Amino acid sequence: MERSGPSEVTGSDASGPDPQLAVTMGFTGFGKKARTFDLEAMFEQTRRTAVERSRKTLEAREKEEEMNREKELRRQNEDIEPTSSRSNVVRDCSKSSSRDTSSSESEQSSDSSDDELIGPPLPPKMVGKPVNFMEEDILGPLPPPLNEEEEEAEEEEEEEEEEENPVHKIPDSHEITLKHGTKTVSALGLDPSGARLVTGGYDYDVKFWDFAGMDASFKAFRSLQPCECHQIKSLQYSNTGDMILVVSGSSQAKVIDRDGFEVMECIKGDQYIVDMANTKGHTAMLHTGSWHPKIKGEFMTCSNDATVRTWEVENPKKQKSVFKPRTMQGKKVIPTTCTYSRDGNLIAAACQNGSIQIWDRNLTVHPKFHYKQAHDSGTDTSCVTFSYDGNVLASRGGDDSLKLWDIRQFNKPLFSASGLPTMFPMTDCCFSPDDKLIVTGTSIQRGCGSGKLVFFERRTFQRVYEIDITDASVVRCLWHPKLNQIMVGTGNGLAKVYYDPNKSQRGAKLCVVKTQRKAKQAETLTQDYIITPHALPMFREPRQRSTRKQLEKDRLDPLKSHKPEPPVAGPGRGGRVGTHGGTLSSYIVKNIALDKTDDSNPREAILRHAKAAEDSPYWVSPAYSKTQPKTMFAQVESDDEEAKNEPEWKKRKI
């Protein structure tokens, strides 16, 4: 296309200015002439220029990609054939250098062309960064980039896989250890809000732990013995969290408040009444207890007197109702554990004959469900618990087994797991908050390994996870639904709390971040003394002595102590005469141990009065002068005559 010059005009302007008009106006000409432009021609020229520059840019990019491919192939060939000739290498280097120069020129031209590019830019999806094969040793074409929607879909799939795997929900990344004592922690209780933990053990102590008020020292803020010298078997907070049910080895359960003060104590029944329904309370040792999940102030206990009794806090003088477990023959059987269902309408108890019996709460006569061989007879079933949906019951038997039951078909267990040793009559089992896992602990002999916390999947009942707790038995376990933390009581006096900072809420996370408080040292102010060893004695100030030493010194001074003079022992001294008989021994010698022998002749003493008796007889002679004036004496008899006169039965037998 030809461009019109500045001198080109169209129409009537080709003939130039009118000379007649110029003469009339009085000037020689009209000056410079205005330029005219062809817009269509200019637009066409611009379009062609843009197309040419875009073509050059695309050619430069294609050349650059081709060079990169050749470099990659050459690198692969060098790796395969390292012993290539030097001439080929030089040739390749020369070619590469020439290509590099050409590529640099093309890059410069492309940069300049990009700067001079006219028209709207290409969309970002069509303009991609050149692939750098030098950075990554990738063979073949690269996969296409993912869209944002595809990435979000993949992330959602990964999250769903994690949610489907219940093991990922176990909070066991961190743990803290609470030192209860040296004996077995046989009871654990956590309030519904998860603020306070209470532990009880074989050492009769009940300790309170406050997560919000506790620091990194992990010390209990209160310790007490509510049942004196009875082992604590069960501790449980009420559904409102204001009361704690304490079940010990005695026959009377207690209810205490959050601070440990007694609220009520159940009455003890009459031991001499045969029918246990007629007694007002338990008459034998308790095993466990449980609060009603819906009704405030109602709880349940089971005992060795073969009864399960329900109580009300407002009426401690008599139980509310009595359930009496029986065998198939109608005989008494001792319940070892009991619990309420989640809605509170059912009461389940496991007995020593291996049976599990479930009653309707309002019907105390006959059980609604009865399975007589749930566990081995003669073993103590330590725990029965309902799932959160209320359809499944888990039982932890003394026969080293864990079984799962469906109460809608209570004729056989759904699943059973064996090889779980237990040596304590209160070994726990519980459900996870999402009802997908079942947890229980195992017992061991001392020095024979470590106690474990075992996790089973509810759907398949496979052992999916284990946690090594400590070198002692695992007795109690508790999985709090709000905190998502696991509490464990062990046989060596420890209570452990397992949590995950990302999955758990509050609880142990509150006290871990607090530093341990430093112990305050008592400071005393004493009088300051300036000691100058070279000062004169008269100006020296005597040092302060202890009170005890000063009293001893004053005691030795008779003037200060006003000590009376002691008696003189032995010979006199200091102007004082020793007293004779001052001691007990000298007094005895003086008064008792004297020689009082009489050397006088008794005959002479009597004959001294003989003449006076003859002259004036009064005592003997006048008495017989009238009655017997002549003196008569008894005749002497021989022993033989006396022997003859004796009776036969008195005679001596020779």
Swiss-Prot record:
Cross-link (Glycyl lysine isopeptide (Lys-Gly) (interchain with G-Cter in SUMO2)): 296, 590, 596
WD repeat spans: 180-219, 227-268, 281-321, 330-369, 376-415, 421-466, 469-508
Keyword Mitochondrion: no
Biased composition, class Low complexity, residue ranges: 99-111
Listed Basic and acidic residues bias regions: 45-78, 165-175, 540-565, 644-654
Modified sites of kind Phosphoserine: 621, 638
One annotated Gene Ontology cellular component of this protein: nucleoplasm
PTM-bearing positions, type Phosphothreonine: 579
Region Disordered: start-end pairs: 1-26, 43-175, 540-579, 630-654
Residues recorded as bearing N6-acetyllysine in the entry: 452
Family (UniProt): Belongs to the WD repeat GAD-1 family.
PANTHER family assigned: GASTRULATION DEFECTIVE PROTEIN 1-RELATED, WD REPEAT-CONTAINING PROTEIN 70
Protein name per Swiss-Prot or TrEMBL: WD repeat-containing protein 70
Protein species of origin: Homo sapiens (Human)
